[in-house]
């Protein structure tokens, strides 16, 4: 009750550049260099700026810019190697669509090669349509702890949608395939859940933050 309503308009944001390194844009009196990939992250950033301005009187714009430019967010179109292999925890239709749109914008000449797993409570009907429309190759797997849909159940869902796919027994096996794709032709995308983060990072020699979940 009596809360202040702030409306963020796309017309208030001036996009300066958008590439595989991040996004630069102008908003209000700010010129922002955001190191996160994806135009959807611009709205997240602008929302954070507005919240900070409400909470902090006379906020220092230089400090805001410095904080943003040092931002990192694991599992959000995160580049895992110098080749084009990414990890994204997108696990619903909107998140997966944003991921696909971002990667296609950055790599318009390449096909998508995916390693996918997901929880059983998601809307697989719409997600399956996205996968069929967007991916040239898709591999499915399950996490070690069995939190996610079994490969057998996920395979049946994709079969009903006439989606060609390869089933593998583990994240490790799927990652090994992704690592060996033709990077001149494909972009590798590992996506669908944060539950596989530790397994994915282990395969790429990256440290796993135990606060991640």
Label each residue range with its predicted role:
Residues 1-2, 20-22, 84-85, 128-187:
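C-terminal helical cap/extension that packs against the catalytic core
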Residues 1-30:
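Extended acidic/charged loop-beta regions that coordinate divalent cations
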Residues 3-7, 111-112, 137-140, 208-213:
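Short hydrophobic/aromatic-enriched beta-strand-loop microsegments
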Residues 10-12, 116-119, 141-147:
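Short, acidic/turn-prone active-site loops that include or flank metal/cofactor-
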Residues 28-137:
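Nucleotide phosphate-binding/pyrophosphate-handling subdomain across enzymes
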Residues 47, 181-196:
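Short SAM/SAH-binding signature in class I
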Residues 96-97, 124-126, 150-151, 199-202:
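Short glycine-/acidic-enriched loop or helix-start segments at secondary-structure transitions
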Residues 194-213:
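Glycine/aspartate-rich loop-and-adjacent alpha/beta segment that forms the canonical ThDP
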